[in-house]
Amino acid sequence: MQKSNNITVLGVSGYARCGKNTFVEIAKNILTKNNYTVIELAFANKLKSEVQEMLRKSGFSLDVLHLSADEKERVRPLFVFWGCQRRFESEGGLYWVNRVDDQLQDIINDAQIGGMSTDRMIALVSDVRFPNEAKWVHDKWDGQVIHLKKWQSEWRKGGQDGSDEFLVKVYDSAPNEEEAKQDPLVEVTADVKTEWEGKGKATAAIASAEVSLQKVVLDALNSTKFFKHQSIGTLTL
C-alpha cells in the first residue's frame, strides 16, 4: 500500500482496564526520547464529547472527561450503547473511524502547511476495539495493531489430594458482552501480541514508571515492522 505521507500509525487493542492508556503513555515516553513526535488519538474521545454534550443538555452535572473509578463503571454501559448505536446507524459502521480519520488528516495537513515533515511522526491510537477500527489502521494508514492482555498471579490448589499449591496466571475476563465478542476478532488481526502483569497502580502516569512495564512496551514497539530491523533503528529506553 502506498501512502501519501510518511506518518506511522500504531493502534493498541485489548479489554477495558488492561492498561492501554498506560501502554500509550509509556510508548509516548519511549518514542519521544528516540526523537519521534507523538500524536495521541482515541475513538473514545469523540464518543465522550458527544455523551458529555447530551448529559449537559439533559441537566446532568457528571463530567465524563474526569471520572473516578466508580463513575467509570457506572457510566460504561452508556458509553457502550452510544458507541454501538452510532456504528449501527452509520454507513458501513464507520462513524467513529471517520471522525478519527478526519482528525488525523487535519493534523497532517496542518503539519504540511507549517512545513513540518511527518517522517518521524507517530500516531498512537489507544482504543482499537472493533475489527473495522483495526482494518482502518491497516488499510488506510498501512499501520499496525498491538494487542495487550493483562494478568494477575494467583495461588491455586491442585495435585491428587488438593494440597499442592501452584502460582498461575489469571487473565482478565471481558468486562461486557460486546468486548467478549469483538476483542477476539481484533486480536486475530493484530500484528503484535503482548501481555503484562497488573500492577494495581492508581494512574497511567504512576504505572508508566514501572521498569518491567517499560520493557514490555519497548519489546512490543520493536516487534512492529517500523522498528524491528536494525537498519531502521530499534528503539531504546
PLM region descriptions:
Residues D127-F130:
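Short, well-ordered beta-to-alpha junction loops that form the rim of enzyme active sites
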Residues A16, R99, E133, H138-K140, ...:
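Small-molecule kinase domains that catalyze NTP-dependent phosphoryl transfer to phosphate-bearing small molecules
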Residues F43-M121:
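ATP-dependent small-molecule kinase phosphotransfer cores
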Residues N29-I39:
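Post-Walker A helix-loop "phosphate-sensing" segment adjacent to the P-loop in P-loop NTPases
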Residues M1-L10:
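Extreme N-terminal, non-catalytic leader segments
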Residues F23:
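Hydrophobic positions on the alpha1 helix immediately C-terminal to the Walker A/P-loop
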Residues K20:
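Conserved lysine of the Walker
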Residues V12, V125:
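Hydrophobic anchor at the beta1->P-loop junction of P-loop NTPases
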